[in-house]
C-alpha cells in the first residue's frame, strides 16, 4: 500500500521519515533505536511505521479484468 503520510491515530506527519527508517533497518540497525533517533516517541507513530507493509509491487503483477 501507499506509505503512510500521517500517523493514523494522532495525525503526526511521518511520510518524510519512512524512507530513512526503512533504509537503516534494512542495513541492520535495530528498529527501536532508529525510531528513537528519528524522534518518533509516541507508540501510535511507532506502530504506524513498523507495521507498514509495501504491497504495491505484489499487486502490480495481477491483471485487472473488466
From Swiss-Prot:
It is found in: Cytoplasm. Its EC number is 2.7.7.6. Pfam families: RNA_pol_N (PF01194). Keywords: Cytoplasm, DNA-directed RNA polymerase, Metal-binding, Nucleotidyltransferase, Transcription, Transferase, Zinc. The keyword Transit peptide does not apply. InterPro entries: RNA_pol_su_RPB10, RNA_pol_suN_Zn-BS, RPABC5/Rpb10. The keyword Cytoplasm applies. Zn(2+) binds at residues 7, 10, 44-45. Binds 1 zinc ion. GO terms for biological process: DNA-templated transcription. It is an enzyme of class 2 (transferase). HAMAP family: RNApol_arch_Rpo10 (MF_00250). DNA-dependent RNA polymerase (RNAP) catalyzes the transcription of DNA into RNA using the four ribonucleoside triphosphates as substrates. This is DNA-directed RNA polymerase subunit Rpo10. The lineage of its organism: Archaea, Thermoproteota, Thermoprotei, Thermoproteales, Thermoproteaceae. The gene is rpo10.
Amino acid at each position: 500500500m501507499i506509505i503512510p503520510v500521517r500517523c493514523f491515530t494522532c495525525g503526526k506527519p511521518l511520510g518524510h521519515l519512512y524512507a530513512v527508517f526503512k533504509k537503516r533497518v534494512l542495513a541492520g540497525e535495530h528498529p527501536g533505536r532508529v525510531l528513537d533517533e528519528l524522534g518518533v516517541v509516541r507508540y501510535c507513530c511507532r506502530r504506524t511505521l513498523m507495521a507498514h507493509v509495501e504491497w504495491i509491487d505484489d499487486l502490480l503483477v495481477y491483471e485487472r479484468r473488466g
